[in-house]
C-alpha cells in the first residue's frame, strides 16, 4: 500500500472517470489504496437526489481525497445549492456532466444533450463558481449527433469558458449519439478522435484539459500527457485496477514503492469490518475488487471464489482470506 506521497503534479494529471453503478464510495476507498495521488470521481449524482432524496448522496470517506463530485442537472440554482453543500462536505472539485448520453439522463435534461445549449451550460457553471471556491469543471464529448464539427466544439468551449468562466474541461474523445445507441454503445461505436482533442488544447492553451476515452494502459496515458494536461481512465481502471499500483511512480514521479495487491486487500479489512457492522453486504464491496489480480496466476480463482461466496449471508473477511490463499497457491 502506498504511503502518503508528495508530487509536483496536480491531481488531475491522472484521474478515474465517474462511472454509474461502479465508482461508489466502496470502490473509491479501494482504488485509493492503490494510488495516493490519482483524482477520484463519484458516480454522477443528480441535483434532485441531493436536494430531495432521503439518503446521504454526498457520503464519502476522508481517505478518498482528492475526490470530485460529479453532478447531473441543468438548473443553475439547484446546481449552485448542491455545489455549496458539496464544498461544505469537503469535496475537492465539482464536475458537471455534459457527456452522458443515456435516455434516462436526457429526460432529466442533463448529460450530453446539454452540449446543444452552451449558454445554459455556461449559466450552470457560473452559478456554481459564484458560490464555491473549489474548482468547477465540465466533462463533455467532442460533439453530439450531427453537431460534430470542430467549429461546434470550439464554440461550446468558447461559451462555457468565457461566459461560464470554466477553466477546466475533461473531453471524451468521441461524439455522442443522443438516440439509437445505448450508453454502452456510445462508449464503443463512435470513433475515437484523439487528434481533435489535442488540437483543442493547442487552440485553448490557457484552459486546463484532460482527455478521456479508450485509454487502456499507463504507456498510453503517458503518450497522451505529451499533448494534454491530464488523462482520465474509465473502464480499464475498474476492470483491471492493478494498473493503478504504478500510477504514483510512473505518472506522478513518486519514489514510493508500487502498491502490492495482497497488501491492498488486507488494508481493506478495517474498512470492510466497519461497513459489515453497519449492515453492508460483503459483496457490495468486493464486487469492485474482482479484477485486482488480472494477469496474475490465480486471478480466475480469485474472481470465481468472491463471486460465488461474497454475497452469502454472514460473509466476512474470511472469504477474502480464502480467496487470497487461492492466488498464493498459484504463484
UniProtKB/Swiss-Prot annotation:
Cofactors named for this entry: FMN
Record carries keyword Protease: no
Pfam family, one: Dus
InterPro entries given in the database record: Aldolase_TIM (IPR013785), DUS-like_FMN-bd (IPR035587), DUS_fam (IPR001269), DusA (IPR004653), tRNA_hU_synthase_CS (IPR018517)
Annotated site, Interacts with tRNA, chain positions: 97, 184, 187, 300, 303
Enzyme class: oxidoreductase
Enzyme Commission numbers on file: 1.3.1.-, 1.3.1.91
Top-level taxonomic group: Bacteria
Binding site for FMN: 18-20, 70, 139, 172, 212-214, 234-235
Keywords associated with the record: Flavoprotein, FMN, NADP, Oxidoreductase, RNA-binding, tRNA processing, tRNA-binding
Reactions it catalyzes: 5,6-dihydrouridine(20) in tRNA + NADP(+) = uridine(20) in tRNA + NADPH + H(+); 5,6-dihydrouridine(20) in tRNA + NAD(+) = uridine(20) in tRNA + NADH + H(+); 5,6-dihydrouridine(20a) in tRNA + NADP(+) = uridine(20a) in tRNA + NADPH + H(+); 5,6-dihydrouridine(20a) in tRNA + NAD(+) = uridine(20a) in tRNA + NADH + H(+)
GO MF entry, a single one: FMN binding
Claim: RNA-binding is one of the keywords in the record: yes
Active site: 100 (proton donor)
PANTHER family: FMN-LINKED OXIDOREDUCTASES SUPERFAMILY PROTEIN
Homology family: Belongs to the Dus family. DusA subfamily.
HAMAP family from the UniProt entry: DusA_subfam
Primary role: Catalyzes the synthesis of 5,6-dihydrouridine (D), a modified base found in the D-loop of most tRNAs, via the reduction of the C5-C6 double bond in target uridines. Specifically modifies U20 and U20a in tRNAs.
Entry protein name: tRNA-dihydrouridine(20/20a) synthase
Organism: Escherichia coli O6:H1 (strain CFT073 / ATCC 700928 / UPEC)
Gene symbol of the encoding locus: dusA
Amino acid at each position: 500500500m502506498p504511503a502518503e506521497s508528495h508530487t509536483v503534479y496536480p491531481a488531475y494529471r491522472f484521474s478515474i472517470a465517474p462511472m454509474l453503478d461502479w465508482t461508489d464510495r466502496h470502490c473509491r476507498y479501494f482504488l485509493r489504496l492503490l494510488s495516493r495521488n490519482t483524482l477520484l470521481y463519484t458516480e454522477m449524482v443528480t441535483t434532485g437526489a441531493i436536494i430531495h432524496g432521503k439518503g446521504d448522496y454526498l457520503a464519502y470517506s476522508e481517505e478518498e481525497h482528492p475526490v470530485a463530485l460529479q453532478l447531473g442537472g441543468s438548473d443553475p440554482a439547484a446546481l449552485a445549492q448542491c455545489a455549496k453543500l458539496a464544498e461544505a462536505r469537503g469535496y475537492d472539485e465539482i464536475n458537471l456532466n455534459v457527456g452522458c448520453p443515456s435516455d434516462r439522463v436526457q429526460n432529466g435534461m442533463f448529460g450530453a444533450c446539454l452540449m446543444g445549449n452552451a449558454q445554459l451550460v455556461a449559466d450552470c457553471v457560473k452559478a456554481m463558481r459564484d458560490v464555491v471556491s473549489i474548482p468547477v469543471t465540465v466533462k463533455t464529448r467532442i460533439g453530439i449527433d450531427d453537431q460534430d464539427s470542430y467549429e461546434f466544439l470550439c464554440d461550446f468551449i468558447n461559451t462555457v469558458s468565457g461566459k461560464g468562466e470554466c477553466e477546466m474541461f475533461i473531453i471524451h474523445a468521441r461524439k455522442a449519439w443522443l438516440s439509437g445507441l445505448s450508453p454502452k454503445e456510445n462508449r464503443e461505436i463512435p470513433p475515437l478522435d484523439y487528434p481533435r482533442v489535442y488540437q483543442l488544447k493547442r487552440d485553448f492553451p490557457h484552459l486546463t484539459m484532460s482527455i478521456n476515452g479508450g485509454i487502456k494502459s499507463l504507456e498510453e496515458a503517458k503518450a497522451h500527457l505529451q499533448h494534454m494536461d491530464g488523462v482520465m481512465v474509465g473502464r480499464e481502471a475498474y476492470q483491471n485496477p492493478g494498473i493503478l499500483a504504478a500510477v504514483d511512480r510512473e505518472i506522478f514521479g513518486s519514489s514510493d514503492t508500487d502498491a502490492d495487491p495482497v497488501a491492498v486487500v488486507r488494508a481493506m479489512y478495517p474498512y470492510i469490518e466497519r461497513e459489515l457492522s453497519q449492515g453492508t453486504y460483503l459483496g457490495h464491496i468486493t464486487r469492485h475488487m474482482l479484477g485486482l489480480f488480472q494477469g496474475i496466476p490465480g486471478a480466475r480463482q480469485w474472481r470465481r471464489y468472491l463471486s460465488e461466496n461474497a454475497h452469502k449471508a454472514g460473509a466476512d473477511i474470511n472469504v477474502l482470506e480464502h480467496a487470497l490463499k487461492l492466488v498464493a497457491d498459484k504463484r
